[in-house]
Structures are given as C-alpha cells and as structure tokens.
Amino acid sequence: MPLKWKTSSPAIWKFPVPVLKTSRSTPLSPAYISLVEEEDQHMKLSLGGSEMGLSSHLQSSKAGPTRIFTSNTHSSVVLQGFDQLRLEGLLCDVTLMPGDTDDAFPVHRVMMASASDYFKAMFTGGMKEQDLMCIKLHGVSKVGLRKIIDFIYTAKLSLNMDNLQDTLEAASFLQILPVLDFCKVFLISGVTLDNCVEVGRIANTYNLTEVDKYVNSFVLKNFPALLSTGEFLKLPFERLAFVLSSNSLKHCTELELFKATCRWLRLEEPRMDFAAKLMKNIRFPLMTPQELINYVQTVDFMRTDNTCVNLLLEASNYQMMPYMQPVMQSDRTAIRSDTTHLVTLGGVLRQQLVVSKELRMYDEKAHEWKSLAPMDAPRYQHGIAVIGNFLYVVGGQSNYDTKGKTAVDTVFRFDPRYNKWMQVASLNEKRTFFHLSALKGYLYAVGGRNAAGELPTVECYNPRTNEWTYVAKMSEPHYGHAGTVYGGVMYISGGITHDTFQKELMCFDPDTDKWIQKAPMTTVRGLHCMCTVGERLYVIGGNHFRGTSDYDDVLSCEYYSPILDQWTPIAAMLRGQSDVGVAVFENKIYVVGGYSWNNRCMVEIVQKYDPDKDEWHKVFDLPESLGGIRACTLTVFPPEETTPSPSRESPLSAP
C-alpha cells in the first residue's frame, strides 16, 4: 500500500557540487586577473575584483617556484558537460534497458563505471556485457534506472513516495551508495503514526539498518498513541516482540500491554502460534492480583497453553513472597525503565539542623534534581544498600544528635517500580554511624554506635526469611568507618575506636564467617567513604583528629589493590567532605554533600573523580547543604513532564 505523506512535493537531494558562474567559452583577459596573497603561500585568483573559484599553492623545486592552480568549478563543468552529451546522444557507447520495459537509456560507460562498482565490474572485469552495446538490467525498473542515471550525471535526486521503492531497488542492485543514503534520510524524516509500519517493512526488505532502528525507536516512544490506531494491528511479530521486551517502553501498564497483545493475536488465526512467545514479554508479576484474576486468567489460552500457565504461576509465587522479591528478580519482574540515576537520601540540613526524609534522583539531561517518594520518617547517618534494584534504608537517626543517642533500628525498602516504601524486619540493635553492604543477596550492618556506646557487632539480613541474625563481630568496636565489597567479601576501613581514629583495613568473608586483617591505609581517617571501581578499592575524604581539640578534613585519597594487598595514593579532593554519600556511576565516583571541618559547615557540593584520568571535578550541587546524606545508583521512573502527542502527518518538506 502507498505510504501517507504530508507533502506530495518531491525532496531534491544534491551533492555539494559548485555551480558554474562563468561561461566556458568566455576568454580570460590578463587585465582582469589578480592574485591575492594569503597565509601559508596560498592565493586566491580574482577576475575584475570577483573571486573566480580558483586557488593556488606555491611550492619550491629545483626549477624554481612552482604554483599549482586548483579550479573549484571544474568538476561541475565536466559533470554538466557529460550530462549535456547524454541528453544530445553524443559519444554514448552503451545503452541500458530496465527489466520491466523496452525503454532505452544511452549512457557513457566511463561515467557509469566511475559512480558504481557494479558497472565498473561489468565494463572492466571481463564479463560478457563488457562488449555489448545494449544491456538489459533485470531487477531494475524503468523509474529506478532513470533516477540512478539522472543522479550519476547531475548529483541530484528527486524523491517522493511514488518513486521511492523503485529507486531503492535500483540503488541496492547497482550499488549506488549515495542514493541509498538519501533514501534512508527521506524515510527517517517522514515517519509518522500512520506510516511507521510500512516504513519498517521497507527497511527490512532492503536491509536499511539505520531506518529499522529509527522505526523501533519511534514505535517505542509513541506506542501508547499507536495503540489507538489501526496501524498497531499491522505490526509484524518481530517488531511487536521487540517493543514488549524493551525497558524503554513507557506510559503503558502491563495490563494495557496484555490487552493490546490479545487484540493483535486474535486478528488472524495463524497469529495464535505466537501467543506464548509474546506473553513471555508481558511482566505479569508487576500486575496486581486483581488484574491477574479479573483480566488475565479469564483469557482462554492463558489457561490452556503450558507456557502461559507457568507465567501465571510465576506471577502468583512472586506476589506471595514480597520480602523475597529482591532475590527473585528476572526480566519479567524488572522495572520498565532504561535510565539509571544517581540517587540521594536523607541527611541533616545546614539550617535549623532538621533531618531530611527526601529521596531524590539527579536528571543528567535536565541538569536538575527530581523528587521521588519521600521516606515515612527522616533519616541521617543511616545505611543504604541495593539488592535487585530495591533500595534498603537501615538504622540511622531521625533527630540531629552527634553522639548517636537517638539511633533507630527500623528498616525500610523502596520499590522504584511503584515509587513506594514498605517496612521490613528491624535490626537486633539500634545503630548509627555504621556501614551497610549488600553482598551475595544479603545485607550486612557493621558496627556503629547507639545510646549504649560503640558497637563491635555485625548483623546479616536475609530477604528470604525477613530476619536479621548476628555473624562474627569485629575485634574492636568501630563507628564512622567505611566499607565496600569486592570478590565476594566485604572490606571495612578506618573509623573511630575508643575515640581514636584508625587506618586499619579488615576483610569479612561470609563463607567462613571470619575477619582478616589487611594492609592498613597510609592515613588515619573516619567518616570517610569507600567504593569499588574495577579491581581497585577507593578510600576518599573523611576527617581526623588534629591533636588538640578539633578536627581537620582529610583531602588525600588512596586506593587498595586486593591482589597486591597494597595502597596507592591518588589525586586529592578539591574540597573536604566527611559523612557523605558515595556512588559509582558510569565508572566515575560521585561524592555527595557531607560536612567540611575546615569550613565548619554542611556542604552541598558534589565532586566527581575519574579513575582513568586521576582527576577531580566539581560537577553540580545538591538542592541544599546536607550532612550525613547517603547516595547510590538506582534504575527508576524519572518524573516526567507531559510530552506532546506525536504527529500523524509527516514533517517532511523538500529542502
């Protein structure tokens, strides 16, 4: 069927060939020629004060100075000359005939061979056509052949939907790559809701990869609008399966996708063979139990097809075990989002020392912070960790207290798929100023302090049972320490023990339930941060006791090699930050907020460290100064503004 296009005017595509400004027969009078000196021994040639499109370059040789002249109009003159010879039937040495008619197109072999590898091989490779005066091109239509010949002789191509497919066929057959590129641009520039399916068909037929990718992107972006048109039902199975499996599909619920897929399947009986394959891409575990019972289980093939029955059982089991969901993740339980962001949580505000309960994500494209669902209660000095893209918030404090006397034991879990929080089992001990790591599907809360004092104990949370249990404790109580994981074990560095800053590094192996001492840091520090990039464990910032009655920022940073058991210094921070949030995003380390002891205030700064370049940069700020804040990366649904509906008409206009 013909594509619907907004304009019937053809698009005219041109190669950048200079336009001839002077007659070829016009004699050049020396009186009107002048050379204008330029830099680097270049000159422009002018005629009567007007630039002629000529340039020259001075070279030295044994024969003396040699000036090389270049005409910027020569190629245009030659091309126009050949085209005029063709139109007048002069010096043509071969006639081309399309496969669908007996029309004849006299051309010059040298022109065709210079523009096409196909013709070059035909006329120079010893093929039988090399000596023929008339050649029939089966597989090339009259319209397509005319377009190709016109382009070769003029560098211009006129395209519209009536001649597009003929032109594509000819360009593909004759290997005229510039024409193929123009056809791709023409198709991409004119995709609409009404023709996207047909454009996709053309892209697949002629193996136009760029066009096919663009159609996929267009359909994904506009799928909700496409569902309301008849074009949706014309989608081929492969493209529909791609869309349903994509994390980039937005603004559609799983129930809407299920109903739409059922419509597509029932349009034609043979399509029912695709039912199981398509239903594997519907995320049934993300539907509500009511939706599954009322709308899914009532569909006949969902009860009779073995694959579909198992999909329903999977969804039912998943929903029956909410605490286990982080360790039951699969493609069908994952959030439909393709954007991972830097996320911050809690902290104490610089003004009034009020504790925050805000959960925010940084939008890299918009260069701004956006709010997600806040916690039920404020938190700072808490621990956060991610399992299966679920964010756990553990312990901390709801009120500002530097001694940790108001530590809490409550634990909450954030589900970015629904932008909601739920409470899970509490810690066995209240703790703040501690470290929390996610390791092998478990959470480990290490040390800290509370109203009873400093803690050496370590607790492990099992999402499968929703319980916290004690594991091997540290040899000494620690608070204000930092930690990270690498190679299936957890590393804890620095911190404070009995009011003394430490530089030791300890390693906990959950398989043996033992702590092992490793090479100490080169600098004592506490309230610092730690993270893993590749095979390096980075220790950043923090503070230490000055020796009198005050503290200093630690600007120096270093990394630990578990393989070598040694530390290496790296570039120092630009500004001191203690009690911060830290996250690794796209192999860069982001240090967020915190407290600067040298400036005696909470800070809003976010600094980024590039391990490859060993460089620090200030990248952006928090909305407010926050100490005791925490950070991580999370795949979320960004809060989005309303986007305009896609056009049903082509935006194409002829240039």
UniProtKB/Swiss-Prot annotation:
- Please provide the Gene Ontology terms (biological process) for this protein: cell division; protein ubiquitination; regulation of cytokinesis
- Associated pathway: Protein modification; protein ubiquitination
Q: Which SMART domains match?
A: BACK, BTB, Kelch
- Kelch repeat ranges are 341-389, 390-441, 442-488, 490-535, 537-587, 588-636
**According to its record, what are the GO cellular component terms?**
Cul3-RING ubiquitin ligase complex; cytosol
| Molecular-function GO term, any one | cullin family protein binding
Going by the UniProt record, its keywords in alphabetical order are: Cell cycle, Cell division, Kelch repeat, Mitosis, Repeat, Ubl conjugation pathway
Q: What InterPro entries does this protein map onto?
A: BACK, BTB-kelch_protein, BTB/POZ_dom, Kelch-typ_b-propeller, Kelch_1, SKP1/BTB/POZ_sf
The BTB domain extends over: 92-161
Q: Which residues form the BACK domain?
A: 196-297
Q: How does it assemble?
A: Component of the BCR(KLHL9-KLHL13) E3 ubiquitin ligase complex, at least composed of CUL3, KLHL9, KLHL13 and RBX1. Interacts with AURKB.
Instruction: Give a short account of what the protein does.
Output: Substrate-specific adapter of a BCR (BTB-CUL3-RBX1) E3 ubiquitin-protein ligase complex required for mitotic progression and cytokinesis. The BCR(KLHL9-KLHL13) E3 ubiquitin ligase complex mediates the ubiquitination of AURKB and controls the dynamic behavior of AURKB on mitotic chromosomes and thereby coordinates faithful mitotic progression and completion of cytokinesis.
Q: What is this protein called?
A: Kelch-like protein 13
Organism in which the protein naturally occurs: Homo sapiens (Human)
